[in-house]
């Protein structure tokens, strides 16, 4: 029988609803489904407990994954996650804006049709000149939004040494630069 216990900081609360774990803190709340056969996730007092009766490699790997997810959720609701992106163009000036729940890029390589990337979850997008800052409590939502914005400006079948226009991730959580 394996058991992992993750302590909750004072400003964080957690609760389970069947297979969904919700963690709330000063930066917001994050809900995630944590389900795997023979693995239970429970909130006991001021800790999140992950238990299993099975000892096979796949179950142990899943328990480690669940532990990382819970730690990321706790970090997200206490400090948040932040990505920085850089807008780069050489000839056609791009206009990047936020409209409703999407990031809109206009005049990319002189195109007339705007390109749109959805904003995932509770991600907050701030545009300041040539820099875009994405922040939020959910690491996956913020990272997915940043990745979709970067992929939106990808130029297929062209030499990337020549066609350098785009929006690029320059700083990620846990890494100094990308």
Identify the meaning behind each predicted range.
Residues 1-178:
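Ribosome-associated RNA-binding proteins
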């Amino acid at each position: 029988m394996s058991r992992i216990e993750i302590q909750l900081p004072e400003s964080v609360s957690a609760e389970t609803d069947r297979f969904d774990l919700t963690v709330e803190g000063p930066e917001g709340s994050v809900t995630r489904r944590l389900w795997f056969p023979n693995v239970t996730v429970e909130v006991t007092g001021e800790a999140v407990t992950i238990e299993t009766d099975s000892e096979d490699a796949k179950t142990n790997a899943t328990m480690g994954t669940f532990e990382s997810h819970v730690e990321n959720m706790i970090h997200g609701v206490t400090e948040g996650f932040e990505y920085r992106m850089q807008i780069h163009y050489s000839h056609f000036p791009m206009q990047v804006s936020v409209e409703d729940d999407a990031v809109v890029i206009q005049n990319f390589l002189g195109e007339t049709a705007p390109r749109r990337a959805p904003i995932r979850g509770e991600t907050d997008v701030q545009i300041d000149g040539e820099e875009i800052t994405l922040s939020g409590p959910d690491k996956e939502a913020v990272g997915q939004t940043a990745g979709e914005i970067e992929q939106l400006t990808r130029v297929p079948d062209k030499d990337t040494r020549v066609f350098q226009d785009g929006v690029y991730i320059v700083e990620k959580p846990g890494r100094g630069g990308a």
